[in-house]
Amino acid sequence: MVGRMERQSASSSASCSPSSSAAGTSSSSSACGGKKRPDILNMIRSATCLNSSSTDTGKGRSKQSSNKVTHGFHLVEGKSGHDMEDYHVAEYKYDKSHELGLFAIFDGHLGDSVPSYLKANLFCNILKEPIFWTNPQEAIKNAYRSTNKYILENAKQLGPGGSTAVTAIVVDGKDMWVANVGDSRAVVCERGAANQLTVDHEPHTTNERQRIEKQGGFVTTFPGDVPRVNGQLAVARAFGDQSLKAHLSSEPDVRHVPINSSIEFVILASDGLWKVMKNQEAVDLVKSIKDPQAAAKRLTTEALARKSKDDISCIVIRFRC
């Protein structure tokens, strides 16, 4: 992620089905990069339900569920001089006779260990919550909190970095639960109009600034011109970031969206897209494209044309095509 975190010098057991990889079909996966991982990450990949995505530019063929929900994704590595730090989930699975569509974008900073861990564990943690089927909103909040607690407790293995998240769970093609921390965003097209489903957790907003300052932190535009928590991080909520744990929040905003005939499609994307494109622009660009993978590719291509230098990850979910 370009510009979110001020980079510093060197001195300073679930049983779920496998997810899609960044390159190829929704049923495949590939190992990330060529860097040696901490042992804890190797253990995660072999023991948990969701393998890591590729760091390469990639795409996924559109897939359709039994409830006529289709999805496709497209990922582009940025031009910031570091490895891809965006990860995604886009898959269907069955739980208690219900079909679940699981979709997420995890936009990392200061390395990709935290988003990789989230890809492997966050949905499993949500679905393992005992109250998931009776109170999905609280289950999602509980899982976000417990996942972040684990990440912070294992910062020595997972590293100093962090990640934003936007997640969507589609239940039987009828209900969708959207949650986020940070500035990765979900936007729905409803009768042709764009409606933002998530909240951009930026440090300069009144509520976030007050919370940060109450916890002993501060918000400043120095260095640079972007408001940052303690001069470091350009989002007020995120997973990880051990050095800022006292002043950051991992509490998600959660929203329930009943899927009715007015809901056409949803776009999930990292800020590499939203920095250069307004919500309605994104919806207008792809509302006539019925193939969700082609729509996701169109959005990332346009973001590149608008000189986005960040990693760009985009998932399009289309209903009842």
From Swiss-Prot:
Protein species of origin: Oryza sativa subsp. japonica
Disulfide bonds: none
Protein name according to UniProt: Probable protein phosphatase 2C 44
Family according to the record: Belongs to the PP2C family.
Pfam family, one: PP2C
Biased composition (Low complexity): 9-31
Keyword Repressor appears in the UniProt entry: no
Binding note for cofactor: Binds 2 magnesium or manganese ions per subunit.
EC number(s) reported in the record: 3.1.3.16
Record: residues binding Mn(2+) 1: D107, G108
Lineage: Eukaryota, Viridiplantae, Streptophyta, Embryophyta, Tracheophyta
Cofactors named for this entry: Mg(2+); Mn(2+)
Catalytic activity, as annotated: O-phospho-L-seryl-[protein] + H2O = L-seryl-[protein] + phosphate; O-phospho-L-threonyl-[protein] + H2O = L-threonyl-[protein] + phosphate
CDD domains assigned to the protein according to its UniProt record, in alphabetical order: PP2Cc (cd00143)
PROSITE patterns xref list: PPM_2
Keywords: Hydrolase, Magnesium, Manganese, Metal-binding, Protein phosphatase
GO annotation terms (biological process): signal transduction
Region (Disordered): 1-36, 51-70
SUPFAM superfamilies with a match to the protein in the record: PP2C-like
Residue span, PPM-type phosphatase domain: 70-319
Organism superkingdom: Eukaryota
One GO MF term: metal ion binding
Biased composition (Polar residues): 51-69
Keyword Manganese attributed: yes
Binding annotation for Mn(2+) 2: D107, D271, D310
